[in-house]
Amino acid sequence: MGGGVEERKVVDLEDGDGEEGEDAAAVAAGSSRETRMLPRMPVRVLLAEGDDSTRHIICALLRKCGYRVAAASDGVKAWDILKEKSFNIDLVLTEVELPLMSGFLLLSTIMEHDACKNIPVIMMSSNDSVSMVFKCMLKGAADFLVKPIRKNELRNLWQHVWRKQLSSGVLDVQHTQQEDNLTERHEQKTGVTKAEHVTENVVHKNMECSEQESDAQSSCTRSELEADSRQTNNLLEYKQPMGRHFSKPDHKNTEKNGGTKIHASNDGNLIPRREEDASLRRMTCSNDINCEKASRDMELVHIIDNQQKNNTHMEMDVARANSRGNDDKCFSIPAHQLELSLRRSDYSRLESQEKNERRTLNHSTSSPFSLYNCRTASSTINAGDAQACSTSATHIDLENKNGDSKTPSQDKRETNQPPIRVVPFPVPVGGLTFDGQPFWNGAPVASLFYPQSAPPIWNSKTSTWQDATTQAISLQQNGPKDTDTKQVENVEEQTARSHLSANRKHLRIEIPTDEPRHVSPTTGESGSSTVLDSARKTLSGSVCDSSSNHMIAPTESSNVVPENPDGLRHLSQREAALNKFRLKRKDRCFEKKVRYQSRKLLAEQRPRVKGQFVRQDHGVQGS
C-alpha cells in the first residue's frame, strides 16, 4: 500500500469532512480492541461494469459504504488502471460479461501478473449457474456475487481484503504504523506522553516479576530486574522538565546515550522515539519469559526432590525389612510397603509381568488326555518368573502367619519349616465338588505345597513324579473295582464335611516318595484327608508356575490313554433325542396333511353359487 495511507483517517470518504475523521481517529485510539478488529484504512475498489446505469448505482452504493471507487466501462480500461496503479487498488469487482475483454480473461490476466495476483477479485453476474461459479473459483476468484447485488454484500467486501492481507502478513506492519500515528495525535491533544505509558507498564511488570520471584524463592532474575530499574530511572530522568538539567537545543531531534533519539515537544518533556520503545518492549517480554522459566524450574526441582525423598524412604524400608527377614525364619513385609517398593524400584518389569498375566489368562495348554512327566523346565523359567515365585511365597508365608492363631498344631509345625512354594495343577476326580461346584467335565485345580529347601518338583534329576505316575497307572490297571467305589464314596462324604468347616480354598496335596499310590488332598484348616480316585483317572494337565501363570508343556509319554466314555454316552443321548424329535415332527406334519386333505374333499362336495358356498337343502340331501 502507499506511503500516504498512514496519514489518512479511519473512515475517509471522498466527500467526507476532516473533522469527522479526526473524531473517529480519537475514538479508535481510545479503544485498543477496535483498532485490532476493524480495518484501519479505506478500501479502494476497482469496478468494471459494462452497463452505465448499473455502474453508477454500484459506485454510489460503494461510496456510501465507505469505499474509494475507480470505475471502468470495459475490461481493457480496467486492466490499464490496474497496471498503472496496482499499489492503490485493494479489491477488484468485475462483471463476467464485459466488452473488449471478458471478465474471465481479466481474471486470468490478473492472476498471472506478479504485482496484481495478490489482489482479491470478486466476480458478479446475473447468471447464477453452478458451472460458471465453479469456473470462476477455479481461475482464482475470491467470491461470486449474483445480481441484483444487495447493500450488505457490498458492505462486507472489506473482509476479503482483510483475509488476503492477514494471510500475506502485510496487515501487521500497517496496523503498527497506524496505531503509532493515532496515539501520537491523541498525545498531542491530551498532553499524555508515550513515555509515561511505557514507564507505568515497565514498573507494573517488574512488580509482578518480583512477586513471582518471592513465591518461587528464586534469585535468578534479580540482576535483570536491577538493570530494568536502572533503565526506568533513566526514563524518569528524561521525563523531567528540560530547564532543570540542560538547556533547550535549537533542533528538535538530538542523539544521546548510544543513538537513542529524543523528541522535544511543546510542553517541555522528552519523548523517546520508536527505537527506545522497541527496546523497552523487548526488555519487558524477556523479563516475562525469564520469570515464567524461573517458576517452572523451581516447580520441577521441588517435584524431583520429593521423588528422591520418597525413593530413599522406600529403599530404607525395604532394606530394614530384608534385614529383619534374614534374622527371622519367617520373612514378612507389609503388603503395602512391598507393593510400593516394587513399583518404585522397577516399573518395566511389573508392566511386562502384568502384560504376560493378561496374555496367558484363561489360555491353558493342558490336555485331559496327557500324563504328568518330568522333562526339565529350567530353560523355560526366566529370572522374572523366579522373582515372582518368591513374591508369591512371601504372600503365602504372611497368610500362614495370620492363620496360626486359629489353626491346629499341624499348621504350626509347617510354619517352622523352610519357606514353601505353591504349584497349582489340575487333579481330575470324578464327582468331587470344589467351592460348591461339581467338576464333571473338568479337573479341579489343586495347589501343591513343598519346602523351598527341597529340590524343585520339575527337576530332571529326581524321579519322584515318574514313580508316582507309573505306580498310579499300575494301580489303575491292577486295582479292583470294589476299592474304587469305596474310595469315591469316601471322597464325597469327607469333602462335604470339609466344605462346612473349611475357610481356605486351596487343596494341599502331599505325595510321599515311599507310598505314591495315594494322593491326599486336605483343606487349609480342617485337617481331614481323603484318598482320591487314582484308579479311574490318571493325573493330567501340566505343571504351571504359580506366579506368572506360564504353562510348562508336558513331556511325551509312551502310555496311551483311552478315550473318555462320558463323551460317547453324551453323544448317544443327543442322537436319541434328535431321532425322537424327528419322529414327532413327522407325525405332526402327517396329521396336518390328513386334516387338510379331508377338508379339501368336504369343500369340493359343498355347492357353490358364483364361487361362494351356499347352504345345502336337507331335503335334497335326503333324496
Curated annotation (Swiss-Prot):
Annotated function: Controls photoperiodic flowering response. Seems to be one of the component of the circadian clock. Expression of several members of the ARR-like family is controlled by circadian rhythm. The particular coordinated sequential expression of PRR73, PRR37, PRR95, PRR59 and PPR1 result to circadian waves that may be at the basis of the endogenous circadian clock.
Name under which the protein is recorded: Two-component response regulator-like PRR95
Residues annotated as transmembrane: none
Ranges of compositional bias, category Acidic residues: 13-23
Protein family according to the UniProt entry: Belongs to the ARR-like family.
Record's subcellular location: Nucleus
Record domain CCT: where: 574-616
